[in-house]
């Protein structure tokens, strides 16, 4: 995926709902695309970078050679990567405020309790990052769910509008995001990254599903 030139892969991709992504070269809110661990999220990021001004968070890998390889692969279609830090969040906020696009993994376990809320995911309460809600609240950017499902001939990219969900309070908004992810998984269960310990951070006293 990261070794092949992006133009040589473009014919493998079909897109549904591209019209939902709104950007503005003249300023004004852009778009926040939420990409869960379903299908091939790296393909989704490459597509967004090739079509729009994409700015995304990136956490460096300890081993420099591997870090160079991953970073080069993720940037090859034009993405600008910023650090997972307060400065990085400021950068993506600035990008979407000025008409750009950012991509976020909404089902990634938050770094600490203050950056997440416990809301249901398939009926089990678990920590869910508040970053998408906070970015939307501070930028008025449109929020879209994007998945890149594997097919026999390549990838089917599907976009879904979540703006109505995001207009609610944080708990309702995050619950709505999780429901949208659940609905995307149903029927595509084999393509979700169940190995990722999504439920490892739960309310005190609740069952440890990985214990």
Q: Where are these predicted regions, by residue range?
A:
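Short beta-strand->loop
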Residues: 32-36, 55-61, 129, 146
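Non-catalytic C-terminal accessory region of glycerolipid acyltransferases
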Residues: 22-27, 50-51, 87-211
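Solvent-exposed coil/turn segments that connect beta secondary-structure elements
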Residues: 38, 61, 107-109
